[in-house]
Amino acid sequence: MSKAVVVFSGGQDSTTCLIQALTQFDEVHAITFDYGQRHNEEIEVAKALASQLRIASHKVMDVSLLNELAISALTRDDIPVSHELMENGLPNTFVPGRNILFLTLAGIYAYQLGANSVITGVCETDFSGYPDCRDQFVRAMETALCLGMDKQINLLTPLMWLNKAETWALADKYHSLTLVKELTLTCYNGIIGQGCGDCPACHLRQKGLDDYLNHKPSVMASLEQKTHGKSA
């Protein structure tokens, strides 16, 4: 029996990954991390979607220690989300160490479940400048997990080379465009669905949706080319 663990935030990307995983694996589990993020609605959205999609299990893990260590606009209510980069060239929504911690814990959870695959929705094509969304980082983490636990743990990144329009196309391919559009939470200001329309996450999400809806045939063709027409 094939098993997978999806790192699941309830946002567009991880929800699309979860929907795809349900077509690829016999047993799909999700893990959501409560790190004291700016909006707790994210946790509730993830719970609701996990229930609606009828996955094998959904674990919510308290990692509030990350909030103590990582100062970011996503972990502090008194730091407004900025469209400008910080002095180090990163957006102020970057949470240092977040994906290092998330992938490590998801790998440990997969080990306990007897799962060989951990799926994460990080993307290098349309990424927001986060260094822990790069393929190079994910491959390094995969090597570390395999060596550290003496077990093959595959870190799968279905969206890594897709742009946001192609990610919308992927959701549509699995007949879930409306679900992802209306029920997921990507907005940095905690507004479900279309979001606030002003934060960087909303801009990227809406631009991708507009691009997909205005150029459906070409975007779907591009998606198929990148995925070689496979569902896996």
Curated annotation (Swiss-Prot):
It catalyses: 7-carboxy-7-deazaguanine + NH4(+) + ATP = 7-cyano-7-deazaguanine + ADP + phosphate + H2O + H(+). Transmembrane segments: none annotated. Pathway: Purine metabolism; 7-cyano-7-deazaguanine biosynthesis. Keywords: ATP-binding, Ligase, Metal-binding, Nucleotide-binding, Queuosine biosynthesis, Zinc. ATP binds at F8, S9, G10, G11, Q12, D13, S14, T15, T16, C17, L18. Its EC number is 6.3.4.20. Coiled coil: none annotated. Binds 1 zinc ion per subunit. GO terms for biological process: queuosine biosynthetic process. GO terms for molecular function: ATP binding; ligase activity, forming carbon-nitrogen bonds; zinc ion binding. The keyword ATP-binding applies. Pfam families: QueC. Zn(2+) binds at C187, C196, C199, C202. Its cofactor is Zn(2+). Catalyzes the ATP-dependent conversion of 7-carboxy-7-deazaguanine (CDG) to 7-cyano-7-deazaguanine (preQ(0)). HAMAP family: QueC (MF_01633). Belongs to the QueC family. PANTHER family: 7-CYANO-7-DEAZAGUANINE SYNTHASE. This is 7-cyano-7-deazaguanine synthase. It comes from Shewanella denitrificans (strain OS217 / ATCC BAA-1090 / DSM 15013).
